[in-house]
From Swiss-Prot:
Database matches in InterPro entries: Ion_trans_dom, Na_channel_a4su_mammal, Na_channel_asu, Na_chnl_inactivation_gate, Na_trans_assoc_dom, VGCC_Ca_Na, Volt_channel_dom_sf
GO MF: voltage-gated sodium channel activity
Domain of life: Eukaryota
GO cellular component: plasma membrane; voltage-gated sodium channel complex
Residues of this chain annotated as glycosylated in UniProt: 214, 288, 291, 297, 303, 309, 327, 356, 1188, 1202
Region (Important for rapid channel inactivation): 1307-1309
Lineage: Eukaryota, Metazoa, Chordata, Craniata, Vertebrata
Protein known as: Sodium channel protein type 4 subunit alpha
One GO BP: regulation of skeletal muscle contraction by action potential
I repeat windows: 113-448
Keyword Plastid on entry: no
Chief subcellular location: membrane
Amino acid sequence: MASSSLPNLVPLGPESLRPFTRASLAAIERRALEEEARLQRNKQMEIQETERNARSDLEAGKNLPLIYGDPPPEVIGIPLEDLDPYYSNKKTFIVLNKGKAIFRFSATPALYMLSPFSIIRRSAIKVLIHSLFSMFIMITILPNCVVMTMSDPPPWPIHVENTFTGINTFESLIKMLARGFCIDDFTFLRDPWNWLDFSVIMMAYLTEFVDLGNISALRTFRVLRALKTITVIPGLKTIVGALIQSVKKLSDVMILTVFCLSVFALVGLQLFMGNLRQKCVRWPQPFNDTNTTWYGNDTWYSNDTWNSNDTWSSNDMWNSHESMASNYTFDWDAYINDEGNFYFLEGAKDALLCGNSSDAGHCPEGYKCIKTGRNPNYGYTSHDTFSWAFLALFRLMIQDYWENLFQLTLRAAGKTYMIFFVVIIFLGSFYLINLILAVVTMAYAEQNEATLAEDQEKEEEFQQMMEKFQKQQEELEKAKADQALEGGEAGGDPAHSKDCNGSLDTSPGEKGPPRQSCSADSGVSDAMEELEEAHQKCPPWWYKCAHKVLIWNCCTPWVKFKNIIHLIVMDPFVDLGITICIVLNTLFMAMEHYPMTEHFDKVLTVGNLVFTGIFTAEMVLKLIALDPYEYFQQGWNVFDSIIVTLSWVELGLVNVKGLSVLRSFRLVRSLKLAKSWPTLNMFIRIIGNSGGGLGNLTLVLAIIVVNFSVVGMQLFGKNYKECVCKNASDCALPRWKMCDFFHSFLIVLRILCGEWIEPMWGFMEVAGQAMFLTVLLMVMVNGNLVDLDLFLALLLNPLNSDNLSASDEDGEMNNLQISSWPIKLGICFANAFLLGLLHGKILSPKDIMLSLGDPGEAGEAGEAEESAPEDEKKEPPPEDDDKDLKKDNHILNHMGLVDGTPTSIELDHLNFINNPYLTIHVPIASEESDLEMPTEEETDTFSEPEDGKKPLQPLDGNSSVCSTADYKPPEEDPEEQAEENPEGEQPEECFTEACVQRFPCLSVDISQGRGKMWWTLRRACFKIVEHHWFKTFNSSLILLNSGTLAFEDIYIEQRRVIRTILEYADKVFTYIFIMEMLLKWVAYGFKVYFTNAWCWLDFLIVDVSIISLVANWLGYSELGPIKSLRTLRALRPLRALSRFEGMRVVVNALLGAIPSIMNVLLVCLIFWVIFSIMGVNLFAAKIYYFINTTTSERFDISGVNNKSECESLIHTGQVRWLNVKVNYDNVGLGYLSLLQVATFKGWMDIMYSAVDSREQEEQPQYEVNIYMYLYFVIFIIFGSFFTINSLIRLIIVNFNQQKKKLGGKDIFMTEEQKKYYNAMKKLGSKKPQKPIPRPQNKIQGMVYDFVTKQVFDITIMILICLNMVTMMVETDDQSQLKVDILYNINMVFIIVFTGECVLKMFALRQNYFTVGWNIFDFVVVILSIVGLALSDLIQKYFVSPTLFRVIRLARIGRVLRLIRGAKGIRTLLFALMMSLPALFNIGLLLILVMFIYSIFGMSNFAYVKKESGIDDMFNFETFGNSIICLFEITTSAGWDGLLNPILNSGPPDCDPTLENPGTSVRGDCGNPSIGICFFCSYIIISFLIVVNMYIAIILENFNVATEESSDPLGEDDFEIFFEKWEKFGPDATQFIDYSRLSDFVDTLQEPLRIAKPNKIKLITLDLPMVPGDKIHCLDILFALTKEVLGDSGEMDALKETMEEKFMAANPSKVSYEPITTTLKRKQEEVCAIKIQRAYRRHLLQRSVKQASYMYRHSQDGSGDGAPEKEGLIANTMSKMYGRENGNSGVQNKGEERGSTGDAGPTMGLTPINPSDSALPPSPPPGLPLHPGVKESLV
């Protein structure tokens, strides 16, 4: 019965769970034999069948699906037959535990002894599957982990360790007994997770019983036990499996990344080898002998004549002067290696670097730049060998503390080499790192889709089962009713009408099995109940109890009182009031600062008490109104109650020390704003989701962090204590160490945050390089991969992924929106009234209501006003009005902006007043709608206005009228605008209609008189401003004008001529731009000009120039306001935005995203305010310290404990009570601190101060408050990780939304059409090339054959790689012997490559230069020879010869020719090529932003004090230096160091009266407020917006590139086709002989190849043939393409398109008319053969008749009745067998001969086999006959 209705489903319930018996095993063996026989039979018959896969829902570890019902107790824990059909012929069985989890085992004997029926094995299985067993193992793992985290364990943990080892051994033994060891499937070692157990146990016994010397490393393996949590906790294995899959996908990116890094490292090695050892060394003091003074007079020393191109690196100079100081010995090497002679900056660990080029760093007076000592950072930062260069480049690509490497390199090598870093950052860091992101994204997306598909399948199955249950229940009820009816009619005993004891009754006339009545009824009911209960959160008794206790309806007065309270509390205005209170409460808490007056402190305390009272009252009233049962059903109410309770607890414990942190819980209340703020709501849901749905991934990350923390502590803890003096002169342990678990945990977290290079230097000093690098790499790869996956899971989570500002799911307005509606109405009313006054009309309230339209639109739709069109305004019947109202609201609430076009429809509100049933539609902006976009029909229905009511469209803010690049009249459609020619347009009206109505004199008649002259003038001006010459001239002037700003640096006062030129140029530019503005006013009119954003920008910038000009004339140029106004000149380059298409596109995209970006930024600010206020509570006034101003040393806490003790010493003048510059004394500075922590720049100082803090106004103490590290850890996770990644998510989603709105034509194509279209698009641009002809000369021909062989190319590639290897082995301090050897090897390579070049030129002659790669090789060879031959000359007079060595590296580019075979890498490079145009546009915008900010920086921060990050090279003094600084900050690197000096606002930090030589500007103080705004805005614009647009574009293009590469046919397939074609068609005629077609298609590569034998296949392709039996390449390619992609209806259209493209690409193609096709040709041949055969048969029959007649005639002599009296046969037969031949024997022979067909040749016919008379010839053996062909041939 169960399976009859749904035969495709497995039998229901417990009946499908059958015990596994010996009979079951025998049945499996029988099925296995049958399957083997069947497969053998299929193999012989060449029948292919699809592979069956195991069912995913019946995998081991998953729960038994619901369709099997609740398994009875007797089948729990015993072997059962496998439910999965896949295993029906495999020796497996399953066991279920009480939790219905499936365990699968092998049915073969375990350990060769224990069969599935053995008592020992069954017992082991019962233990293994028991939930308590896994619980016990989990409980043992946790204490084991705790013991391992002890840094100095007592002796007793050794016994604990042995206990854990014993438990693990017992677990493994149980598994082996239950499963078997390793031979079959599902045995112990077949599970990779068990390898972990096995290795841990083996290591434990090894260390216990075998003496292995230093076993600390082996003991570290014990930490792997913690990974067992992954095997025990359900779901974690799946997550780890998915992670491993994503690693597999990364192989191609990793190869490309390593290749690029190697090339960049080689470039770095050649450019900067040894540079970072150049230091400033004090020049030796003068010394005399008795006769000679040899210091001061010698020109080689004088500072004036010091040759800056020489580095002092030897003692040759001293030797040359030995005779002058014969009595004095001087050890030069010892002197220059003595660190005491190096120049150190204050507080620096390494000596100051310097360089010998003009733009490198220079030494102070008395010091010289000499190459000596070790490299910076313990000697680990250098380019001296390939390995260190590779590490440096890896660090640069990861962007970890790269500003340090950047500054060191530029100081040593020169600022010109900034170009090197720009290339690495943009190509390596932004592109390759984001490619890794893109690949993992795809892997995650695929995995997500698979999971969703599986869930969908389960859901469908569940629905199917529910339907089946319901159907069965209905049938049973019907049957019972029928039975009852029959029983009643028969008057029978009702007790006998049904049997409740499970007996079966069969309906009369029904065949088949008897039907179960009562037991089936109860079974179905139980199943239904079980399915329903599965969806309930709590057990049923809980609901009964809750209804009694938690619902308060005791008496009628109480219920009435409750209803009144409900009415008040649930009012939207109360909600609004509470929201305002939350905002005010947050503001009150944010007003705390230091120092704060006592009165202000009291005000804040009272305010907080009031707010606590308000929120308590709200909670109590809601409890009364809703009852606790309803109240606690809502998450927000639970949240409220927790916060209120904690507030009261905090008030009670206010004086308890250390519990002030409880105040922080009140801050969380501001998150309640999420209730009415969708973006904040989404943000909180994302975070909640990471703890819920993504909890497993978070747990895996936590396990990895804990594991590596313990590993680090075990491996390196002892080293730190023993080798601490290597790192610190005072032998004190550093802050970052692995001596205990907490510090080790912090270091692992720091590495995961991307800060690994600084800890690495210290660790390599104490722990050795190899060991730490291994651990570090493992932490980075494992941790960052999980981290990245977690990030992507958040980023790509389906939760609101397409809808960032979605409101509640039901689409209804929330209480805040409802309550704010009247307020918005009031504001609109006031606006309309004021506008009426301006227009000279006093409007009545009714008129204002009419003019307003729908007030909801102002609040909800923003830019677009939408309401119901006239044709919808029909009066619905009263009884349906509520339903219609709901329906209409539901549809129109979700209309939004359709296709990005704002619709505007006027609503006649009089109709609404007269018709109360008319629906008011409150639209919601598109980004707030939860529904999909309406279809075209819906759009037409709801948003198409009547013709007469279409309003005048305002000018699109994205178009640039002012730029004159894309000016169109405003009322036209965008499509029409794009198509029309702007030259033929007419100017618009000058003024708006309102202005003309107000001032009638503005209306001019343009048909006559002055009006006509005015119109003519306007048209002339219009033509001028629209002319492309005017635009070009204008753009050039803007660029020149912007360029002049770059010269206004600190040296402008000294360059009088340049200054004068700039002043005159500024005036000229101002006049020209005023003229341009006036021209545009006349041409466009005020209406158009002032309704365009770009024109407003122009207008404001020109205004600033005019004001500056007037102020100069009047002599007020030195006034403060005028000076600050001049700063705004930095905005001039913004005018270039509207002139350059590429930048404008990017800006338009950004402008479209700005509302959403601002929304999320605001959310981030709300989220950060919690941490900022918390920081103020925790650290305000606690991070001051006492310092000695002369030595900059801090006083110890034992000497000076607090501020009062400090103040008693301040009178000495050499000490100071100092605060950290970036601190938590108020919320604003707290925000700045958090920004530094979030960007990981400057955060160490903030964190150290916080951790050392004690109480207010007390001296800090080293790590006294160590757990304050957790504040920063929590902020980094929630404040930095989530907020910044949400912003990235927003930008990517917004980018995709805009792309959808402005989507291309692809949207209207099917997937199949896209494939065809892409294949044709690639194919169309190709054409067969004429190959280079082989020379006639014999020797040249031989060389030609040699150089065109593939082996020759591969050999050259190998030599190129070997050449790279020889360059890699170069080091800085290599011996002379090594130098000579490498020189000779390089010489050999140059000879080889020159030889290759010469040979190719000899063989290919002038054709050599027709190939791009050959020209590339030629240039490299020439430069290599020039560099070798003229190195001395070049070094002396021109550039460094290292540049020529770098040019040799260009040869490695040839290796890229080999990547045709590497499809994955080709896809990545293809994605880069596709991204380049968009990335170029973003790069332009970034350059513009950098330019503006560098000008602004020069004008504001040029003279700040040189300290921290600002020094003699990195500053804002010149334009070049500013650009270098801003490039650094683009990745948020080093901005804290640049900001610190700008925060100096007065003495003693800086001197406001300091004179700056060469200028009139005084002082070296900064402006903190301007500095903070400058850096924060730049970081947000560049780092968060522009850089993340890079990510969006790369993700998008990588997806496109992957789609392209996954197409069956790619560009390379077509390239290979034409390459092969060149060999078969050497004359490039585009035709091939039909006879050569078979060979040609056989030489192609898959998928286009048709392997031999292919004759019949080619015939079926039906290829057109032209005279001469030739076939065109296009026809062949098209046929092969169709063969690969399959046939479809669009093929003909696509073929035409392809031919058009090919004709365009191949103008030489001769038009041809095919005369036949290959199929027709074959059919013609077959027909000819058939006709021949038929005719032969006919002749044969006649010949036989004639022969018979002749035989008879020879016997009886009768001559009558001859069949052939005359003709060919008669004559021939007569000649051969006539009477003249004599006797009959001859005739007999003739008959025999004739009968066998030998007469044929004599009659001029081909001999034929009689068997051929019926059928055409068979194909050769081995060639299958194509069925279609066979039919046509026969």
